[in-house]
């Protein structure tokens, strides 16, 4: 699926439409149990739209810039209000995932729910909008027409409210409310539930912001993360964060365009 979508995307880039280049890079130091680790990652892609058709592909560095792998590759079209996408794309499931950029969320770490499921999948996606309501259904697998080898996930939104699921029988489902400052969600995975609240707590002159995340789950465990983010200019930010889950302190620099 990756090679097919990539070859189609390359042909589309040379054939029609305006192309925009987007990407994100981040380098972060983590200190956990007095052990320091450095992680650096770059993602770069080209995306275009022309006469109802959309297409794009992106690559990511692997193993701290030692190698490069395919991150995203898809083609799509708008059929009178029904959007169809084929290839490797971002899954439709939660508010946290919907507001992420190339898999990066507001801070340096993601919620437990976000990290539990693949953010990018291969298959076919159908979606559309009607007023304030929108929906997207993903059929995931090498053969999307084979019910035994494919799975389904999706998301429905009505204003600030959202509902997402994974599996034909809703084995995993989430309900959330979100805005530009954060979200509150409740996710059930075969009876094991997790509640998450994340958001910006304060801002100073649109340059510095403090944020936090709290999780509470079916095991009666509460974890949290707190951080600060300083945006030097559009797309460039320094972030510091403490995550209670591993008692780790992280410092990072991120740029996006």
Regions from the PLM with identified roles:
Residues 1-17:
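Gram-negative bacterial Sec-dependent N-terminal signal peptides
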Residues 132-134, 147-221:
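Detector for outer-membrane/organellar transmembrane beta-barrel domains
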Residues 234-236:
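C-terminal beta-signal and adjacent terminal beta-strands/loops
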Residues 158, 226-232, 244-257:
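Outer-membrane beta-barrel "beta-signal"
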Residues 23-29, 57-61, 86-88, 137-141, ...:
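Transmembrane beta-barrel strands of outer-membrane/channel proteins
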Residues 113-117, 212, 228:
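Short Gly/Pro-enriched turn/cap motifs at secondary-structure boundaries
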Residues 34-42, 67-71, 118-122, 129-131, ...:
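Residues that define the transmembrane beta-barrel architecture of outer-membrane proteins
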Residues 13-30, 34-142, 155-159:
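Outer membrane beta-barrel
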């Amino acid at each position: 699926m990756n090679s097919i979508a990539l070859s189609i995307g390359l042909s589309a880039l040379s054939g029609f439409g305006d192309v925009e280049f987007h990407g994100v890079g981040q380098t972060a130091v983590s200190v956990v149990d007095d052990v320091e680790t450095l992680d650096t990652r770059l993602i770069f892609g080209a995306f275009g739209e022309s006469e109802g058709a959309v297409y794009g592909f992106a690559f990511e560095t692997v193993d701290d810039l030692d190698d490069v792998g395919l991150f995203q590759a898809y083609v799509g079209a708008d059929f009178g209000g029904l959007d169809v996408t084929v290839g490797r794309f971002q899954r439709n499931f939660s508010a946290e995932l919907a507001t992420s950029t190339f898999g990066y969320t507001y801070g340096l770490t993601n919620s437990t729910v976000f990290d539990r499921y693949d953010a990018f999948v291969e298959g076919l996606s159908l979606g559309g909008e009607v007023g304030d309501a929108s929906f997207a259904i993903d059929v995931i697998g090498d053969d999307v027409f084979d019910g035994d080898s494919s799975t389904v996930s999706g998301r429905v939104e009505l204003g600030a409210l959202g509902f997402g699921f994974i599996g034909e029988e809703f084995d995993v489902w989430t309900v959330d409310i979100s805005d530009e400052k954060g979200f509150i969600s409740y996710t059930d995975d075969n009876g094991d539930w997790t509640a998450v609240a994340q958001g910006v707590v304060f801002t100073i002159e649109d340059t510095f912001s403090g944020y936090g995340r709290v999780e509470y789950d079916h095991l009666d465990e509460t974890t949290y993360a707190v951080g600060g983010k300083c945006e030097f200019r559009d797309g460039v930010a320094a972030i510091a964060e403490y995550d209670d889950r591993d008692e780790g302190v992280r410092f990072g620099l991120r740029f996006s365009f």
